[in-house]
């Protein structure tokens, strides 16, 4: 019953179609179609034609109406009603197509073929045509075998993917509500059933289940109820289902496009938001509601219309289904709960209410319960959330400020947050589904893509979302038109088929350009993006700009009245659409509150934080607010580069999708909406007609009918249909094309039904299906014949078996009858009893011998069985190995094919890379030198940093020492106040110097700001250049399209050069691919350039800061040189410690040597291990750890040495403290220390900054190193893959070497074709040069176009000025009223004239429309007539075929009759032979009967005689017994003869019956042949007449074609003249370009010279600075020596004073003690001696002081000289600095000049300069990469060499294994040979046994013959006995005596003979 119900909605009712009454009515009434307002078209009968009008009678009401002839359309015969393929209609027009679709729709047939695609009308009800049984019905069937269905389309796509190995796509297109989503689901259902790896119906695979469950999840979250559709997809999706080589599903991937996220916050009237919101609120349990804080429907603001229900759907049940689908998809419960929390959070966001405060515009949140719920659900802090919305932190300059938000801003922020949250959740869900669907490890070979995207939408007012959706549908419709109409016809021309290009007028490119064109003039999306950049831009300004730029576009319209709400209109292919541009700028930028975004990123809920992980890519509201304040594009820059608008992202996504679809074979399904009321069984004809016109259905049918939609490659055609032409192709090699020509000749196809191209055979619609049917019939015939042979063979076998059984039965019967006769005979019984006794002894011996033989035989049998089992096991092993080898071979072949492809790609890549390498090798050396120079500078900087660190450490120690001394010096500060005043003066001087330095720093900062402004201006220029590049690319594309059109026209004319055009198209495709690659590379290059610029600026900043630090450090060094005197004394201790340090270093080097040795050992071990990478990495890590440990030890030792140094310094300080003479100087030093401490604090601050910058540089360096390592890893992986590929290549090479032998025979045939190819290549080269010239010309045209555009702008400006002048003149004209009146009269006259002209124009337009209609009608009629003509030709060709087939049949029948005659003659001859045999057998039988009668008579005589003998004598018993035996034998012979006679009689009867049958059949066949011959003769005469008519018609057509060709030749000549003019233009443009390039090269050379001069000045400056530093160091050392000398002089002066004091004291004592006595004389002498001694000492000290003074003077002189030198060096440095500044100024001036030059050149040559700059940057970047990669490559080469050694070792091992296997195989073969020999010996023994058996049989036969001879003797004796009595006695006695003398052996022998006789 279910099947019958389904058939009703699938198959057409044949009784309705074949109604003869309807056919007669149609023919009688001349029915036609007439336009109708109600039903589109209605039937009417044509009554009368009057001029251009016709009178028709409407069928419905019988009214007569006058109609224009052009409006009448022909009606098809009733047999074409509800036709499955509308391409079969005889009259193809809108009315017929609409009627066919309507009839089928009302009958429940929703699917109809329309040529190559399928049309589906939404039934708005469930139909029983999608069950598993229906799927099985369509599985593997051809399209024409089953009625139209979505399953049929899917199955053809699947089968063509499997056969052609080409990716497929199924595009379901149509308006919203047409049924695209449902058909997509059915496609997935069919594929999941057909391509499932689990073949049982009950057990479906997990992947297939998940694939089927992906749609319900996506529908729940992405679909919604709209006015047109209850389950409208509010996003687009492209489902890619991947299949493996066997056709099983291995995975899937879903890509989504443009989710309508605004539906989450507001909906139109009677519409719903996304289904999941209603599912959750209806289906959630109480526990879940409390957890998710759910409320009733009317409590949510975001549910605009409350609870809107969908008829026939329960939201509660759908919730359970969605949750079950997520469970099947493998989404865990935690993630499910996370999704539901986010949904509830989105709803709660709508409930947050803001109010405006009284006095200010600031927003406030009076009730924060909703905010608390939101923060609870999303895991964030409430206060932070409310603060982030009401008073977010906004960046102003470099600071962050909290800005209060207005109510409108807060509401916008909440809505934006809700939309973004839902969109991110949806994107996460799609990624999660893709992860689940793509988890299989099997490799996907090809895929089927299913596109389900939002249909065309036309509302009252349409927004940005509708523009994107309609733009997508325009692109898809353009793809359909391109594939159906343009690519189809281009393929005809490529293949060299005679074809006139038909322009169907369905090009949608103008509308697409209006939306997407980037420049010249820019499209709507480009203008929207541009407006987003401008400050104070509004939606109104955007609309004004659109009207200004695109106001004159044919597809663009302004609103006609001011009352219209729409801002502008676009004429799409589906109709005119009004757009309202409210909030388009915001929608395009899609801004967010970045405070809330960061808060959500830091959420405690893992799911929410995962959704908001890419916070750094969003556009903040502060950036959008900045639009009104700043004009800089930098305001829109995020952390990772410039932001991308929604329009840009969607455009890129769409371009990617279109590229994917173009690379597949598309299968179109056109979905049609029958009505807007969503009612079943209702069809609005006007709505359907509009959709048919838009979708290009009629044009698709027309090209399908006129063109050749079916095409087959030569080889495939030969392989598939050679069975239909078995003997047409000769044996041996033949070209595919020649073979196809011969096959088509043999098939006798009409020449109009096919065309033979260069590589394919093209057929009209239906021809291939007919061939397929014939092929199926042929195959069935072959299989029937094969079955008949098999059945005959089996029957013969069974018959032979039955015959054997019959003969066996007869033998058994005979033996049984003989046994029954002998059973009751007494002698037999005695014989049976005696015989075993006699044979016992003999049997025992025989048994012994037999047992021995049996034992031997059994042993042999066991041995043979063992051998057999061994052989079987060996065979099974060999079979298994064979299977394994076959599998490996198959895998290897597949791998080989893949490797071939890979090899081709790699070779192409290799060639490209080699070219790039050759280009870059010249610059590598320069870059290496530059790198070395930079490394040297880096080393210098590191050395400077180390020196600074050491000085800082010394400062630290000095500071500690001074702090200790500070306590002792505080008491003496009062004495040093005068010195303090001096120091204050010095401080003032230092302050002045500090101010000077600060001024210099300010100058540097201003320079830095200027540089930043320059960088910004450069960024602006870069953006402009990028925009210009995009414009030029768009123009290039447009020019390419124009060039393609020119080439198409040229292809029409140049029919002979089709092959060359094919190759040009291929080259263009390659160029397009290269351009795409170039664009990608340029994008990467620009990104890299941006990074390089940033790094360069950072580097310059760092260098500037380092220079400042160096200058400050040099100043500090001058102050610190005074402390170095104390350090010189500690140098000895330091040397000792240095020796210890060197010892430690030697120890460290020893340890390093040991580690190196360990590493070598490890590397040797690693060679033996298979996985080299892991072990190497582990060893590297351990090695690094050891190095770090050694470094730590080294640093510890250094620290210990530093501590010891510090201790020595402290000792030295304590010793110096003892010197009291230095107290005055210490005070001075204390003051200096204060200054130094301040300076040191500043230096430490700067040092920290420098260290931070250094760390940043190191981080960048580490990042670069990481990138390099990643690249190295990739290179290693590629190297491994290359090695694998090389291994596979070697295998493939070995195979190819085998194949070369086969190809050698073909090479001779290929030489001729190669010569032709060379000629074609030459022509191609010439064409390619022409093509290049055309491209150059195109570029020049572009430049001219730009100049013209500039001129146009200038003219527009002039026009504006003129308009202003006109307005002024109008004001003046207002004074003259009289003039106005005359002007008004003139105006009225002009208006009247204009009205008259308008009327005339309208009349002309109407006439033109009429002419167009007549033209279209006539064209359609012409097409119909052509179709009829084709049909008639086909019928004629079919009749000719039938005639030829009839002739063939007749010939076959004649041959069959001849065969039958021969068979009859043979049968008659056999019958005669059998008759003669029968007669001879009858004679033989008569003779046998006679013999039998004689034998019976003799038998009777013998019986009587026996009785007599028995009665008379007992002695003769034995002889009587023998006679009875002979009698029985004779009786048996007689019976055998009888049976033979009966058999012969049966055979004779059978032959007679067969003879009669043959005669009857022959007579019947003769009569049938005569009748058929008469009928065929009549048909052939009629066909000949028809053919003559057709030939005449064809001749007329041929003449028309000749005329057209002559016209085409004239047009071709004109085009060639135009081409020459264009070439002249190209030459001039090339000259201009060369001049520009020369100027550019000159500028570049000047730039290089400037750069070199700058480098020289820098080097000289650095040398001067180094000399100045050295001089300063010398001066400081001299100053230190001078101070030391001054200290020594002071000490000497003190000693001198002490000595003088002592002398004075002694003199006083002498004077006082002069009056004492002689006792004091001795004391006096002693004292005088002491004085003399002291005087000597004083003289010595004076000499010393003089020497010291001399030295001091010398030191002062040296200091003065050093100061003069220093001043000279400073003046030199100043001069150099001035020179540098002057050079920088010159450089700036040159840069300005260069920019001016570039500005002048850019107007003409922008594209070339940008390309060159991009190439330079790209090459520099590539050079850096190459240097890095070269270093990595060296390492990889070493690794690869090691691997190669390992591989060689493995190869040697495998060779040994192979040799072992060969030895084993040889042993097995020898063993097999031995077994064979043993078998042969056994067979010989069997033959010997058979020979012995035969010998025994011969002996037995001899014995029987002797027995017969004895019987004969007995019979002769009997005869003699009968003759007389006397002689009878003697023999009787003799016989008695003989009987007495007879031995037992003779008796036994006689008995044996009798037994043998009986056995016979």
Swiss-Prot record:
Residues that bear N6-acetyllysine: 8, 102, 299, 435, 613, 860, 975, 1024, 1234, 1249, 1357, 1392, 1404, 1410, 1459, 1638, 1793, 1802, 1845
Signal peptide: none
Region (Disordered): 1117-1137, 1877-1918, 1934-1960
Positions where Phosphoserine occurs in the chain: 628, 1114, 1714, 1943
The Myosin N-terminal SH3-like domain, residue ranges: 27-77
Predominant location category: cytoplasm
Residue ranges with Basic and acidic residues bias: 1122-1137, 1948-1960
The IQ domain, residue ranges: 779-808
Coiled coil: 837-1926
SMART domains hit by this protein: IQ (SM00015), MYSc (SM00242)
N-acetylalanine, modified sites: 2
Record PTM N6-succinyllysine, positions in chain: 850, 1669
Keyword Cell division (UniProt): no
GO molecular function per UniProt: actin filament binding; ATP binding; calmodulin binding; integrin binding; microfilament motor activity; protein homodimerization activity; protein-membrane adaptor activity
UniProt keyword list: Acetylation, Actin-binding, ATP-binding, Calmodulin-binding, Cell adhesion, Cell shape, Coiled coil, Cytoplasm, Cytoplasmic vesicle, Cytoskeleton, Methylation, Motor protein, Myosin, Nucleotide-binding, Phosphoprotein, Ubl conjugation
One biological process term in Gene Ontology: positive regulation of protein processing in phagocytic vesicle
PTM section of the record: ISGylated. Ubiquitination.
Keyword Acetylation: yes
Residue ranges occupied by any Myosin motor domain in the UniProt entry: 81-776
Pfam families recorded: Myosin_head (PF00063), Myosin_N (PF02736), Myosin_tail_1 (PF01576)
GO terms under cellular component: actin cytoskeleton; actomyosin contractile ring; cell cortex; cell leading edge; cleavage furrow; cortical granule; cytoplasm; cytosol
Region (Actin-binding): 654-676
Quaternary state and interactors: Myosin is a hexameric protein that consists of 2 heavy chain subunits (MHC), 2 alkali light chain subunits (MLC) and 2 regulatory light chain subunits (MLC-2). Interacts with RASIP1. Interacts with DDR1. Interacts with PDLIM2. Interacts with SVIL. Interacts with HTRA3. Interacts with Myo7a. Interacts with CFAP95. Interacts with LIMCH1; independently of the integration of MYH9 into the myosin complex. Interacts with RAB3A. Interacts with ZBED4. Interacts with S100A4; this interaction increases cell motility.
Family designation: Belongs to the TRAFAC class myosin-kinesin ATPase superfamily. Myosin family.
Record text about domains: The rodlike tail sequence is highly repetitive, showing cycles of a 28-residue repeat pattern composed of 4 heptapeptides, characteristic for alpha-helical coiled coils.
Protein name: Myosin-9
Organism this protein belongs to: Canis lupus familiaris (Dog)
Gene: MYH9
